[in-house]
């Protein structure tokens, strides 16, 4: 497994995050999203209800088994004790852990034995991306997002792409991108240097609720 292909996806990775209903999860699966994300950080507006989390997990596993298509449940955490993360991983059947705090992704990966997506903030965390490129860790994907994450704040894509292009081996730098993505701009995001996947939450919502049409259009535009 490599940083790019541990999910088994042959194209760009598409993650729909902040799911809070089985209906939205079913839409994401039917639209061919690769990764379904649930917020496991307490007291956030998109924090998942435990009952719904288990139902979404069952949907992901049933879809994977029936279709043979790799789909994964991603649990999003932020500066939570490893033991608490492990408890929810086991309870919800989480496949991939996404870390949005100051955690050491290596420590959590070793403790949990799971793939990790690590949120990076540009430009302060560029050294983590460079280190990952040189070490080629297994089952690890960097993710550029805003400091808070889930705010819909549009990142400075051009600065990130320009920075990648200036590096000694730009072809070795791969990461997912989040922050302000929508069905309308996701195609442009995937054409930037280094981007191998996209992560959306608010960009597929209407009045704070996941919108099936927006989810379907986002995935379609990302995959075409």
From Swiss-Prot:
Record GO cellular component, one term: cytoplasm
GO MF term list: phosphoribosylanthranilate isomerase activity
Pfam families assigned to the protein according to its UniProt record, in alphabetical order: PRAI
Pathway: Amino-acid biosynthesis; L-tryptophan biosynthesis; L-tryptophan from chorismate: step 3/5
Catalytic activity: N-(5-phospho-beta-D-ribosyl)anthranilate = 1-(2-carboxyphenylamino)-1-deoxy-D-ribulose 5-phosphate
Keywords: Amino-acid biosynthesis, Aromatic amino acid biosynthesis, Isomerase, Tryptophan biosynthesis
Domain of life: Eukaryota
GO BP, sorted A to Z: L-tryptophan biosynthetic process
PANTHER family, A to Z: N-(5'-PHOSPHORIBOSYL)ANTHRANILATE ISOMERASE
Protein name: N-(5'-phosphoribosyl)anthranilate isomerase
Species in which this protein is naturally found: Saccharomyces cerevisiae (strain ATCC 204508 / S288c) (Baker's yeast)
């Amino acid at each position: 497994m490599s940083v790019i292909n541990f999910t088994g996806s042959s194209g760009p990775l598409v993650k729909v995050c902040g799911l809070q209903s089985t209906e939205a999860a079913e839409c994401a699966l039917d639209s061919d999203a690769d990764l379904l994300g649930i917020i496991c950080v307490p007291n956030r507006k998109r924090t998942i209800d435990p009952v719904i989390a288990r139902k979404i997990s069952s949907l992901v596993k049933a879809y994977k088994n029936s279709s043979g298509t790799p789909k994964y449940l991603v649990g999003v955490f932020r500066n939570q004790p490893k033991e608490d993360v492990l408890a929810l991983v086991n309870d919800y059947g989480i496949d991939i852990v996404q870390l949005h705090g100051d955690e050491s992704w290596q420590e959590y990966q070793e403790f949990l034995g799971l793939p990790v997506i690590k949120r990076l903030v540009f430009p302060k965390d560029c050294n983590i991306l460079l280190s990952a490129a040189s070490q080629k860790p297994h089952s690890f994907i960097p993710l550029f997002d805003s400091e808070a994450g889930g705010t819909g704040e549009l990142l400075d894509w051009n600065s990130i792409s320009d920075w990648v292009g200036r590096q000694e081996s730009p072809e070795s730098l791969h990461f997912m991108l989040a922050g302000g993505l929508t069905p309308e701009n996701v195609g442009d995001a995937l054409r930037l240097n280094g981007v191998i996947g996209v992560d959306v939450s608010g960009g597929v919502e209407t009045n704070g609720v996941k919108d099936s049409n927006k989810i379907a259009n986002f995935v379609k535009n990302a995959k075409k």
